[in-house]
């Protein structure tokens, strides 16, 4: 079979899921799950290598359309198909999923309780998350979205902390409850018009009445806003992070939150552009609320996990502002922020888990003075914190700068609105280094807790932990120094999406029409297209 016709995405999705089914058959000679760990890590690594090969050989950066397409009739009577593919919106997040999931397998090495079931869920989650980003059928997307909740719930409920049952139940109630909006909106879109179809491209090509679009958009926004999360739909996240283990942290922060951002791009902006034009100012304001509220709340937290969790919510606010900017630069910054936060969030939460394994406390008041005994941990914490506070030369700086400049140059909003939004968001940016640097001081240089510093478990980072952080820092710094590494993957798709969104904004459309009219009055200029706006 030729490279171009090989079913790459189906193979990449099904390999970890099928491999998970063989875990119960594996021997466990030492009773510690060593064989199962290595098996799962190798499966994850092989799947990621296949993903990189597919990307390198079959993905064309200059093509804005769907690539690596596979489509098989499943239930043709209702237009249901197994249809997968990748474009600029999904490919960066598919690569991110493979990368973070493989590292999470390695991060899970200390897990010894019910090892078989733990790695079974990890592998099933791996394939399921890629399916969410690759599927091109809205009903299958809903099934994948729902099935993804089951491994997360079990990973929280079985391997979480003292309040794991509460956190897992809250997670499932929030996410499963909000998913009803996806189901209702999906059925309404599919059965609207003469053709019954759940295909993304068919749904995007349909014309919907504006009132109907607004209802669909609101339903999707609630469902995806829970997963992003958007304040005030965020309260499940600090509780989930507060009880999760390190590998589950990495999957939550690195991948799960990006599912909400991706769906807003794909469904809300891509399929409902007229409704997006009306909701965009609300998205921008919600983004500002996310940035400010979560930054202030993080500043007040004394629990290390909850502090980083609120920091994550704050950073995801930039995704909303970029999505509502109506500029290619703003949309590009929003996409880059999702990739950047996936890497930075995974690194910070892994370090939180590694620190807890040594100190057995999450309270900053009980830490202090451990810098002398954990110098490598301090170096890793400091570097990752610098990435989170958007230090120049790291991915977060480029992403946030692109969002700010993209929004500032948008011609969809008046100057007073832009000044207010940028000023308020800038306050959140200023707060970030304050709470992160004070956190580092309290952990490593605060008043020494002799009971803690003299304990035998307080040892420096081991090679496995250094390797995981090094793997995460390479793309963080690489993107920060050369953003085109990532932006070239989705630029062509975002050019197409930006044009579609801008044509739906009355102010921009009127300006474009006026520009064309003015040009038509000049000899030799009538055939020329109006220059890009913003």
Curated annotation (Swiss-Prot):
The protein's UniProt keywords, in alphabetical order, are: Membrane, NAD, NADP, Plastoquinone, Quinone, Thylakoid, Translocase, Transmembrane, Transmembrane helix
Where it sits in the cell: the answer is:
Cellular thylakoid membrane
Segments passing through the bilayer: 6-26, 38-58, 93-113, 117-137, 138-158, 171-191, 210-230, 245-265, 279-299, 313-333, 335-355, 377-399, 419-439
EC number per UniProt = 7.1.1.-
* A GO molecular-function descriptor: NADH dehydrogenase (ubiquinone) activity
Among the GO biological process terms of this entry, one is: electron transport coupled proton transport
UniProt key word Calcium? no
Reaction it catalyzes: a plastoquinone + NADH + (n+1) H(+)(in) = a plastoquinol + NAD(+) + n H(+)(out); a plastoquinone + NADPH + (n+1) H(+)(in) = a plastoquinol + NADP(+) + n H(+)(out)
Which enzyme type, at the first EC level?
Answer: translocase
Which GO cellular component term is one of those annotated? plasma membrane-derived thylakoid membrane
Mode of membrane association? Multi-pass membrane protein
Q: Fetch the Pfam families from UniProt.
A: Proton_antipo_M
Question: Which superkingdom does the taxonomy of this entry point to?
Answer: Bacteria
Q: Which family does it belong to?
A: Belongs to the complex I subunit 4 family.
Q: Extract the NCBIfam families matched here.
A: NDH_I_M (TIGR01972), PRK02546.1 (NF002713), PRK12561.1 (NF009212)
Its annotated function is as follows: NDH-1 shuttles electrons from NAD(P)H, via FMN and iron-sulfur (Fe-S) centers, to quinones in the respiratory chain. The immediate electron acceptor for the enzyme in this species is believed to be plastoquinone. Couples the redox reaction to proton translocation (for every two electrons transferred, four hydrogen ions are translocated across the cytoplasmic membrane), and thus conserves the redox energy in a proton gradient.
PANTHER family registered for this protein in UniProt: NAD(P)H-QUINONE OXIDOREDUCTASE CHAIN 4, CHLOROPLASTIC (PTHR43507:SF21), NADH-UBIQUINONE OXIDOREDUCTASE CHAIN 4 (PTHR43507)
* Name under which the protein is recorded: NAD(P)H-quinone oxidoreductase chain 4 2
In which organism is this protein found?
Synechococcus elongatus (strain ATCC 33912 / PCC 7942 / FACHB-805) (Anacystis nidulans R2)
């Amino acid at each position: 079979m030729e490279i171009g016709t090989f079913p790459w995405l189906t193979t990449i999705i099904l390999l970890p899921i099928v491999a998970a089914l063989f875990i119960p058959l594996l021997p466990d000679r030492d009773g510690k799950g060593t064989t199962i760990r290595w098996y799962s890590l190798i499966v994850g690594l092989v799947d990621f290598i296949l993903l990189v090969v597919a990307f390198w050989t079959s993905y064309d950066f200059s093509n804005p359309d769907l690539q690596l397409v596979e489509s098989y009739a499943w239930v043709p009577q209702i237009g249901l198909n197994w249809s997968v593919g990748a474009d600029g919106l999904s490919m960066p997040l598919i690569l991110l999923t493979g990368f973070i999931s493989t590292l999470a397998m390695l991060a899970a090495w200390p897990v010894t309780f019910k090892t078989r079931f733990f790695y079974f869920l990890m592998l099933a989650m791996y394939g399921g998350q890629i399916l969410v980003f690759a599927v091109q059928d809205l009903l299958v997307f809903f099934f994948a979205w729902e099935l993804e909740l089951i491994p997360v719930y079990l990973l929280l409920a079985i391997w979480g902390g003292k309040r794991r049952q509460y956190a897992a139940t809250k997670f499932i109630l929030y996410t499963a409850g909000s998913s009803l909006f996806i189901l209702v909106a999906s059925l309404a879109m599919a059965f609207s018009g003469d053709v019954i179809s759940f295909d993304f491209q068919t749904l995007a090509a349909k014309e919907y009445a504006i009132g109907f679009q607004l209802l669909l958009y609101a339903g999707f926004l609630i469902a995806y806003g829970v997963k992003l999360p958007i304040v005030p739909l965020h309260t499940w996240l600090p509780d989930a992070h507060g009880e999760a283990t390190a590998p589950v942290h990495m999957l939550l922060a690195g991948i799960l939150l990006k599912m909400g951002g991706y769906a807003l791009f794909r469904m809300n902006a891509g399929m409902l552009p007229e409704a997006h034009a009306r909701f965009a100012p609300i998205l921008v304001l919600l983004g500002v609320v996310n940035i400010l509220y979560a930054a202030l709340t993080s500043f007040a937290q004394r629990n290390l996990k909850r502090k980083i969790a609120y920091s994550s919510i704050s950073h995801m606010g930039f995704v909303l502002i970029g999505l509502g900017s109506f500029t290619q630069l703003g949309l590009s910054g929003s996409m880059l922020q999702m990739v950047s936060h996936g890497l930075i969030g995974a690194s910070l939460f892994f370090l939180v888990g590694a620190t807890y394994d040594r100190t057995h406390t999450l309270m900053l008041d009980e830490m202090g003075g451990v810098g002398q005994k954990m110098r490598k941990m301090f170096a890793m914490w400091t570097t990752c914190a610098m990435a989170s506070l958007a230090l120049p030369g790291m991915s977060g700086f480029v992403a946030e700068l692109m969002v700010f400049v993209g929004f500032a140059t948008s011609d969809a909003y008046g100057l007073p609105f832009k000044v207010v939004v940028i000023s308020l968001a800038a306050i959140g940016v200023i707060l970030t280094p304050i709470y992160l640097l004070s956190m580092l001081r309290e952990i490593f240089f605060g008043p020494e807790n002799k009971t803690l510093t003299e304990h035998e478990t307080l040892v420096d980072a081991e090679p496995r932990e250094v390797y995981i952080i090094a793997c995460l820092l390479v793309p963080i710094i690489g993107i920060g120094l050369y953003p085109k590494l990532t932006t070239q993957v989705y630029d062509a798709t975002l050019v197409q999406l930006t044009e579609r969104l801008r044509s739906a904004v009355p102010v921009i459309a009127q300006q474009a029409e006026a520009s064309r009219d003015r040009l038509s009055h000049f000899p030799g200029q009538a055939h020329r297209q109006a220059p890009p706006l913003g």
